[in-house]
Design a protein with these regions (language model features):
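N-terminal catalytic cores of NTP/NDP-binding nucleotidyl/phosphoryl-transfer enzymes
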Residues: 3-12, 16-79, 193-225
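Conserved short loop/turn motifs at secondary-structure junctions
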Residues: 28-32, 60-68, 90-100, 123-124, ...
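Active-site cores that bind ATP or allylic diphosphates and position pyrophosphate for catalysis
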Residues: 59, 63-65, 108-268, 326, ...
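Charge-rich, well-structured scaffold segments of protease-associated domains
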Residues: 69-83, 108-111, 293, 297, ...
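A glycine-rich helix N-cap at a beta->alpha junction
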Residues: 73-99, 105-106, 113-115
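Core subunits and conserved enzymes of cellular information-processing
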Residues: 228-232, 236-238, 302, 306-308, ...
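Long, charged, mostly alpha-helical binding arms that flank functional sites
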Residues: 246-325
Length: 546
């Protein structure tokens, strides 16, 4: 957020003109689900803008809609924000804290003739809404103020069923902006609120509550996504017609859309509830808790958001950019370790049965201070099945009958006898080591292939899960007619390697600790299941930054 953008330009103009003296923003998530990468853009813009100008950013739970809101989500949202490195200080609020004041301001609108109680049913409301050439209609628009006030009080007292009455703003039934055609401000709902319990049975609509909450908190710049641009006139109307202590300015920016991903809370909830994924923190989910469990770092996510930038135009961002950012971050700081995901046994025929020697292996070639570690070498080894081909394709430089390869950081070996199981699969491969090559390749021999390995005696057992994109279709926001996201689920989004082998030290890796498995990819120790390593991202990067 260090770079300037059009939001900063607007703020600079207001500060210079004296329309604002401070920069005070807010991040108002609805606590009915977990934050995802899309929310992260808004979060970074809100907190980042305040940081840029030395201002403040409030955290406000937008819990005016009681349906599906839960303290579980409140706690998770706080954890995610702190994980990304932001803090709201002592400025944590709930939208429901303002219910009483919001109700009083609704009464003020009624007294001033700016609101009325309407008893159109939802079907009638749609029928009388009009179109671009015909104004909306409400036979209750001229209801006396005293009658509207009495009905509004009785609505709060619980005298009427849901849908019987609403409170509507009196603005302009002929407006070309349908949001201004006497929008509903309050509706009756008999549902328990996660904080207020059953105290309230009338709840304010978002378009009414939100500007009031901003104004009561002294917010100067209300930054929100582009779908609220058409709601801005209503936002301003509420501020102008209610006795509130400040006049915030709403500024809209484009939402974040990413390829091969759905960011709709409804769809994400469905993925969880139908068991397609294993909870909100499934490592394939775009939720921040899912990305964190998979192994994404805060730095990589913030780098991604920074590269995407802030614009007014909606666009579809290649998920490859997000993968590129975490790959760059982990390449710089993740220690290297050896893992054999699909092991096949190798026996070094000319190596002593009872001997163990240790080879020095670099921890991170990008960080000289990371030093080296000792990796044990014994007669029996594990190599990856992909590094052997009995009938090799052209330009196959790994292990093959009669061929030579270097075992990484150790000896050159030559392939000899191949022993098979009854079903024809390879049971073990016998090799002969050139024991004079432990410290480097002789100058008279060219060895094109180097493969990784582990001692069969010392390697630890593990499970590795190769996570990939959850959906095969790039633009999940524009599916062909008749298709749903379920038609594009990637059957290989989580490939489990049940019999993986890893360096012995990895048996004691801390949950969430990250490594580069050499020649494979970047992995993170799972935070829930012992002995499981989640692939964060593959080693190779086909994405080309613009």
């Amino acid at each position: 957020m260090a770079e300037s953008n059009f939001i900063h330009d607007f703020i600079d103009e207001d500060l210079a003109a004296g329309r604002a003296s401070t920069v005070h923003t807010r991040f108002p998530p609805e606590p009915n689900g977990y934050l995802h990468i899309g929310h992260c853009k808004a979060l970074v813009i809100d907190f980042g803008t305040a940081l840029k100008y030395g201002g403040l950013c409030n955290l406000r739970m937008d819990d005016t809609n009681p349906a599906k809101e839960d303290t579980e989500f409140v706690d998770a949202i706080k954890e995610d924000i702190h994980w990304l490195g932001f803090d709201w200080g002592d400025r944590f609020y709930y939208g429901s804290d303002y219910f009483e004041k919001t109700y009083e301001l609704a009464e003020e609108l009624i007294r001033n003739g700016d609101a009325y109680v309407c008893e159109l049913t939802p079907d009638q409301f749609r029928e009388y809404r009009g179109d671009l050439t015909h104004p909306a209609v409400s036979p209750y628009r001229d209801r006396p103020k005293e009658e509207s006030m009495d009905l509004f009080h009785r609505m709060r007292d619980g005298e009427f069923p849901e849908g019987k009455y609403t409170l509507r703003a009196k603005i302009d039934l002929a407006s070309g902006n349908f949001n201004m055609r006497d929008p509903v401000l309050y509706r009756i709902r008999y549902i328990e609120h996660h904080r207020q319990g059953t105290k309230w049975c009338v709840f304010p609509m978002y378009d009414f509550a939100h500007p009031i909450q901003d104004a009561l908190e002294g917010i100067t710049f209300s930054l929100c996504s582009l779908e609220y641009e058409d709601h801005r006139p209503l936002y301003n109307w509420v501020i102008e017609h209610c006795s509130v202590p400040s006049k915030p300015r709403q500024i809209e920016f484009a939402r974040l859309n990413i390829t091969n991903t759905v960011l709709s809370k409804r769809y994400l909830r469905n993925l969880v509830e139908t068991g397609i994924v294993d909870g909100w923190d499934d490592p394939r989910m775009p939720t921040l808790c899912g990305l964190r469990r998979r192994g994404y770092t805060p730095e990589s996510i913030l780098d991604f958001i920074g590269r995407v930038g802030v614009s007014k135009a909606n666009s579809l961002v290649d998920i490859g950019l997000l993968e590129h950012c975490v790959r760059e971050d982990l390449n710089a700081k993740a220690p290297r370790r050896i893992a054999v995901l699909n092991p096949v046994k190798v026996i070094v025929d000319n190596y002593p049965e009872d001997k163990t020697e240790y080879f020095d292996v670099t921890n991170n070639p990008n960080d000289p201070d990371a030093g080296t570690r000792k990796v044990p070498f014994t007669k029996e080894l594990w190599i990856d099945a992909d590094d052997f081909a009995e009938v090799p394709p052209p330009k196959f430089f790994r292990l093959k009958p009669g061929g030579e390869v270097r075992l990484m950081s150790s000896y050159i070996v030559k392939c000899g006898e191949i022993v098979k199981n009854e079903d024809g699969t390879v049971k073990e491969i016998h090799v002969t080591a050139d024991l004079e090559t432990g410290t480097g390749t002789p100058t008279d021999r060219k060895i094109k292939g180097t493969i990784h390995w582990l001692s069969a005696k010392y390697a630890a057992d593990a499970r590795a899960i190769l996570y990939d994109r959850l959906f095969t279709e790039a633009n999940m926001n524009d599916l062909p007619e008749g298709k749903t996201y379920g038609d594009y689920l990637n059957p290989e989004s989580a490939v489990v390697m049940e019999k993986a082998k890893v360096e012995p030290s990895l048996a004691n890796a801390a949950p969430g600790e990250k490594f580069q498995f050499v020649r494979i990819g970047y992995f993170s120790k799972d935070t829930k299941n012992p002995g499981v390593f989640n692939r964060v991202v593959s080693l190779k990067d086909s994405y080309k930054p613009q």
